[in-house]
A protein has these predicted regions:
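A generic secondary-structure micro-motif detector
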Residues: 56-57, 127, 153, 185-187
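Non-catalytic C-terminal accessory region of glycerolipid acyltransferases
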Residues: 2-34, 160-290
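Membrane-anchoring hydrophobic helices of lipid-metabolizing enzymes
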Residues: 1-96, 101-111, 143, 286-290
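Structural alpha-helical scaffold elements that stabilize or flank donor/cofactor-binding regions
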Residues: 89, 140-141, 167, 199
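Structural motif corresponding to alpha-helix initiation and N-cap regions
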Residues: 80-83, 134, 158-161
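Short amphipathic alpha-helical segments and helix-helix/interface helices
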Residues: 67-68, 111-114, 138, 164, ...
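Catalytic core of membrane glycerolipid acyltransferases/transacylases, capturing the structured
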Residues: 91-153
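A conditional alpha-helix N-cap/helix-loop micro-motif detector
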Residues: 76-79, 153-158, 189-190
Length: 290
């Protein structure tokens, strides 16, 4: 399912960023660019809305109904492999899930694992600027189970960490995308950032490592893309080591997760992971017809 109109310029940005070795750089062309003051107001509004229990509860229920509708539409296109690796995991204090980020709706892939297999609630860490989105996607960003992240050190050490702790202590699952930026339908795993693993170490929760393979079909989606299907691969569970610092833990877990995802990519697509650009790196794109 394609959201957001033409992706031609986005794909050009992906190609250029690969050439420049800027593998975590933003590629979307219409993302909000906000000042620190505007972001602070967004976050204040988000938390004030959550405090209005009745009004927020109604909108939260509507957001969940919307998600349920999309889940029914997408369910047949999502296959889950490796869930047996989670059979003995202790989720009493929750867990963090990491995966590759390639579509505004790829959270539905993780949601299927969390809700149908683990029987847990999913919370999603989103960038603060996502709260400024308009339309139905903006509504979902503001009223689903989300935890906005910001570049503010004070916010990260205070509000964000405490909200993350509260959600995890309730036994919920939190999705964090360690690649940070979304690259539309990009197949490859990109370098990971340390935040997800740092918080896993500080809060002493496991990290569930995942990788989604994107499969092409011959079914037309729009004028630029064919439809795609998805294979979510559960790669393993990473645990913090209580004998080393959170920083050392985060580096070790990041490296282990990257190696798992790299191997998963290479096994899924039968090719070595190399950061060059090829047309086949963008799933479903109809290069020869555009």
């Amino acid at each position: 399912m394609i959201i957001g109109g033409s992706k031609k310029d986005v794909i050009k940005n992906i190609e250029q960023n690969v050439l420049d070795n800027e593998l975590n750089k933003k590629v979307e062309i219409n993302d909000a660019s906000l000042t620190d003051e505007e972001i602070s107001k967004l976050l204040d509004t988000f938390y004030k809305n959550k405090s209005k229990k009745i009004r927020y509860g109604i909108k939260h229920a509507l957001a969940n109904m919307t998600v349920s509708k999309y889940m029914k539409m997408l369910d047949k296109d999502i296959e889950i492999n490796g869930s047996e690796k989670l059979k003995n995991i202790d989720l009493s204090k929750g867990a963090i899930i990491t995966s590759n980020h390639f579509n505004p709706l790829d959270t539905f892939i993780i949601r299927k694992l969390v809700e149908k297999v683990l029987k847990k609630d999913l919370y999603i860490v989103i960038q603060d600027t996502n709260l400024a989105m308009s339309g139905s996607l903006g509504f979902l960003m503001n009223y689903l189970n989300v935890i906005p992240v910001s570049k503010s050190p004070t916010y990260l050490a205070g509000t964000f960490k405490e909200n993350l702790r509260k959600v995890l202590n309730a036994g919920n699952i939190v999705l964090i995308y360690p690649e940070e930026e979304m690259w539309f339908n990009y197949r490859k795993i990109r370098p990971l950032k340390r935040g997800a693993y740092q918080y896993a170490a500080i809060l002493n929760v496991p990290v569930i490592s995942c990788f989604t393979k994107i499969n092409d079909t011959d079914i037309l989606d729009n004028e630029e893309f064919n439809k795609t299907t998805y294979e979510l691969n559960v790669l393993g569970v990473l645990y913090p080591n209580g004998e080393v610092s959170p920083r050392v833990n985060s580096i070790n877990m990041l490296n282990e997760d990257y190696e798992l995802k790299k191997l998963a990519y290479e096994m899924a697509y039968h090719k070595k992971l190399e950061y060059t650009f090829a047309a086949s790196d963008i799933a479903g794109y109809r290069w020869n017809e555009i």
